[in-house]
Structures are given as C-alpha cells and as structure tokens.
C-alpha cells in the first residue's frame, strides 16, 4: 500500500484514501463526489466483499494492490525512470493532493480535500524523532505522523493492518520498536495503561501524543501520574 501511495502521487494522481470500515454505499458516495472511476484495493476478505457490493452500485475499474511477494519476484533493474511532469509544481499548490474523509458516524462520510500546499506544510513540520503510530493511513493522524518522520529521515513504525489492536499486541509492538515518539488515539493509550508493561514502554518514549478524539480526563490523569510525557495534537 505504501509503495502504491507514493507511486500514484509521483505519477501526478490525486489519491483518495478510503477507510476499510466504510460500507459500499459510503464508498459509492465518496467516489461520486470525487469523480473517481478507479479503485485499488487490498486482499483481505472484508475488503473484497465491499468491492463486490460496490460493483453492484456503480461501474468502476477495480485493481488489486500489488502484493509484497510480487515485488520481491520482480526483475531487478539498474535503470532509473525519469518522470517528465506536464505541470509545473508551483501551479499545483492549491490543487488537491490527497483526499481523506470524515468518519461518517452521523451519516455518510464527507470528503476532505487537502491541497498539495497544505500537504507539504503538514509533512515537513515533524519533530525529528522516530515515530510509531498504529493508525492506518486513511486516518489523517496516522498519515501525517508517518510522513513527518520520513521527511526528517527518521524511522516510521506502522501497525500490521491485518492484526487487531489488543493490549498484548500493542505492548509487544511498542517494546520491539522502541520509538522516540508514540502517537495514537486515546483508545490505544487506554489499552497500554491497562498493562504494567505498556506503561513501562510508554515511559521510555521521549514524547507521547494523541489525536483523532478527546482524551478522557481519567486517562489523562493516569498518564500524568505514571510520569508519561503526553500531549494532545489538534487540527491535523
């Protein structure tokens, strides 16, 4: 997915990131507003089911995302592909670079058009720390934190989307990655503070941040009492 995202952007396409939790009706609604006629999708059973339902709602070209095994088997080449852009970068600043969307918790999701200029500003303002964010890239908080780390040439650790978020799994991942900066949603922080090992792993981070939802007072007080350096991120 990561390679596909960068490849499409490099080729000049505006990429819309759809949540795997959306219904076919919600996907159809967003595709219509964005005038999108092609969908690249993952290989999980739930995603394939949604794609089948989507095809019954609208004619759209569907292409599976290239899997890692296919890339490993690809013929290696020392040649470098030079992309000649038809548009000058300065003329693209105000045009959409990425399309995200709201959760749709109160109805159909709303598209969020993010310009190239806004994207560049957001991606380049990182804190120069290795980062772990278990949120997927269709979540603005997950996308921004990963890109900010990459731009600063720091490691961006990500979660395996095929695995559920659990206290044990998240604690083990945090212990293995040992990031300087851990950022996620309050729900994941609650999972970690429920385990002494999770609290210990959070203490080792230089900074811990949450976004995407307000942090409950009880959780915030607990993090502070455990001497975890935590703060909130707003406006992503």
Over which residues does each language-model region extend?
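Short beta-strand->loop structural element characteristic of the AMP-binding/adenylate-forming
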Residues: 1-5, 9-40, 110-113, 133, ...
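Conserved S/T- and glycine-rich ATP-binding loop of Class I adenylate-forming
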Residues: 8, 96, 102-105, 131, ...
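Conserved G/P- and acidic residue-centered "switch" motifs that form tight phosphate/ATP-binding loops
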Residues: 12, 105, 153, 212
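Conserved ATP-dependent adenylate/AMP-binding module captured primarily in the ANL superfamily
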Residues: 20-53, 73-79, 118-132, 165-180
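ANL superfamily adenylate-forming
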Residues: 44-96, 108
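Conserved AMP-binding A3 loop
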Residues: 88-124
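Conserved AMP-binding/adenylation subdomain of ANL enzymes
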Residues: 119-130, 138-183, 188-191, 195
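Gly/Ser/Thr-rich phosphate-binding loop
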Residues: 179-183, 193-236
């Amino acid at each position: 997915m990561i390679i596909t995202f960068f490849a499409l952007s490099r080729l000049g396409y505006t990429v819309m990131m759809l949540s795997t939790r959306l219904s076919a009706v919600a996907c159809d609604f967003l595709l219509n507003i964005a005038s999108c006629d092609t969908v690249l999708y993952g290989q999980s059973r739930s995603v394939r089911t949604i794609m089948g339902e989507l095809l019954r709602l609208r004619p759209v070209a569907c292409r599976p995302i290239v899997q890692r095994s296919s890339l490993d088997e690809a013929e290696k080449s020392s040649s470098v592909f030079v992309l000649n852009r038809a548009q000058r970068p300065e003329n693209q600043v105000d045009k959409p670079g990425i399309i995200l969307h709201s959760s749709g918790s109160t109805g159909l999701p709303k598209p969020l058009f993010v310009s190239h200029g806004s994207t560049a500003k957001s991606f380049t303002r990182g804190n120069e720390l290795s980062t772990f964010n278990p949120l997927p890239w269709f979540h603005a908080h997950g996308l921004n934190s990963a890109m900010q780390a990459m731009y600063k040439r720091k490691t961006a650790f990500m979660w395996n989307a095929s695995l559920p978020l659990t206290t044990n799994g998240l604690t083990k991942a945090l212990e293995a990655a040992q990031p300087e900066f851990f950022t996620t949603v309050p729900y994941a922080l609650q999972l970690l503070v429920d385990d002494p090992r999770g609290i210990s792993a959070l203490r080792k981070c230089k900074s811990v941040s949450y976004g995407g939802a307000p942090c409950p007072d009880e959780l915030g007080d607990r993090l502070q009492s455990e001497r975890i350096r935590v703060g909130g991120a707003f406006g992503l």
